[in-house]
């Protein structure tokens, strides 16, 4: 589902003149362990803890995360590219959120990673985008409290998303639970 949504998003972006590709998607436990150890070896453990996930805690191991790079603007910072602007404006329509936004490090626990997008499904992505919250904040406020279906109101997104957003089920909330960490 996430891979299909990403392909659909890339095709739409190309149609709008924005070009990007997935640099990193799924990463195995062993590959994540090796990546973290390499980062820690060359940069120190405190740097690695703030900038990478240990094995077993990476969103990339879920198959729901993708790091994006601009195809034709490689000399620029990703945040200065047309690809980034397109993703900021459109990714939620395809079920993706910018997982670690700038200025929210104290909330997410990670250094800003503007190229790291997480698939959470269209309904949740659009609700998160409309709320202006990080995914961690949105999950804690609106998704996690409704584990008991009997306690969940008809629509937990009605005050925080556009009128077209549909209610989010407990199953969607559980599937969309944030991972402990990024890349």
Task: Give the ranges of each region predicted by the language model.
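Cell-envelope/glycan interface and biosynthesis
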Residues: 1-160
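Ser/Thr/Gly/Pro-rich low-complexity, disordered linker/stalk segments of secreted
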Residues: 152-183
